[in-house]
Amino acid sequence: MAKGQSLQDPFLNALRRERIPVSIYLVNGIKLQGQVESFDQFVILLKNTVSQMVYKHAISTVVPARPVAHHTAPAAGDSDSQSEE
């Protein structure tokens, strides 16, 4: 499993399970809002008044409406996850 997936999947899964409203900003500046209905390696299905399939490569930022408890343990040797300056 790729390192990126180990962060994405638990985060998106928590958003889906808890039905947390999200704002998704695309690389072209467009803001989409809704709830994560499902996702896979390449797309997120976002539900609002309609369902939209959003390609992950077009996403800049995912902003939850409230804090998300996504239980991920830092990988061994991942020094920047706990560092403070």
Swiss-Prot record:
This is RNA-binding protein Hfq. Belongs to the Hfq family. Residues 9-68 form the Sm domain. One of its GO terms (biological process) is regulation of DNA-templated transcription. Keywords: RNA-binding, Stress response. GO terms for cellular component: cytosol. Signal peptide: none annotated. The gene is hfq.
